[in-house]
Design a protein with these regions (language model features):
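A hydrophobic, multi-pass inner-membrane permease signature
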Residues: 2-298
């Protein structure tokens, strides 16, 4: 009787594992196949799109990438995205890391109020406040023009980076402070005894210990900033304003669809995807470690 029960439990466990693996493989296929198709489409000649869409490319037609990079200004758009993303990440880390450290490691008056305010920010969808942000910047720009002759708050990559960093603060501080709170206080106390300052303790002890979570935050926010479209399109509305990659890609797709230049369109899409894929491959191990350690400590 016991052997029968063990066999049935093993059979159920094996069936469960098979189901899990089947679902995972199915999800992987649904992700890999479209990405692979886009990469293949980016090196096809235009005539190949009118045949079998699943056929392998007849050759490597790199002119699509050249046309997208030079003719469609994707190189210029990529540089703008690199500047905005790097600046937004730098501003975000400069503000969020000390803020999360103070909120998680020190007890002071108003700490709970600040935590509540940052928590409330998690429930605000950024897409819903794009118009108020635009109106606020526009009115401030009008005031600057009236008093100083010119404004700089709209169609400005630096201002766009500041807005990106500000909208990402609640999530970043919430996640980092939760991780910082799980770190032991023994190292800090030993550092204080040795005469280390609060800043030195934060930068030399706490931040290295929290490296996995910091890398996770950087990757998540990089993906968010790199692929962001609504805010960029709204705040960079002038025809002469610099464009980021998502906005430039949409313009490219509309232009190439009307001209039936599908190869150039997919080549532009590949240029947008490549940096995120390369970054993920480079930090995959640290990202997994950060998520695992955070889950275990939580």
């Amino acid at each position: 009787m016991q052997n029968t029960t063990e066999k049935s439990s093993r059979s159920a466990e094996g069936l469960y594992k098979f189901f899990i693996y089947f679902v995972l493989v199915l999800l992987a296929v649904t992700i890999i196949v479209p990405v692979a198709w886009v990469f293949m489409a980016s090196i096809k000649q235009n005539a190949e799109f009118y045949g079998n869409p699943w056929a392998l490319p007849a050759g490597f037609y790199w002119q699509n990438s050249v046309n997208a990079w030079n003719g469609a200004k994707m190189g210029e758009y990529m540089l703008n995205s690199v500047i905005v993303t790097a600046l937004a990440l730098a501003l975000l880390l400069v503000v969020a890391l000390p803020a999360a450290y103070c909120l998680s490691r020190f007890h002071f008056k108003g700490r709970k109020i600040l935590n509540t305010l940052f928590m409330a920010g998690l429930f605000i969808n950024v897409n819903y406040i794009v118009v108020p942000i635009f109106l606020m910047l526009r009115d401030s720009d009008v005031w600057l023009k009236g008093h100083f002759g010119s404004g700089f708050l709209l169609n400005n990559l630096v201002v766009l980076a500041v807005v990106y960093a500000a909208t990402a603060l609640p999530f970043t501080i919430y996640l980092l402070s939760g991780y910082f709170a799980t770190l032991p206080h023994d190292f800090e106390e030993a550092a204080y005894i040795d005469g280390a300052s609060y800043f030195s303790t934060m930068t030399r002890i706490i931040f290295p210990m929290a490296k996995p979570s910091i890398i996770t935050i950087i990757l998540f926010n990089f993906l968010s900033f790199w692929n962001e479209y609504i805010i960029s399109m709204t705040l960079m509305s002038s025809t002469k304003a610099p464009r980021t990659l998502p906005v430039g890609l949409l313009n490219l797709m509309q232009a190439q669809q009307s001209a039936a230049q599908y190869g150039t369109m997919y080549a532009g899409l590949v240029l947008v995807m490549l940096p995120t894929l390369i970054l993920y491959i480079c930090v995959q191990r640290q990202l997994t470690q950060g998520m695992t350690v955070g889950g275990l400590k939580g």
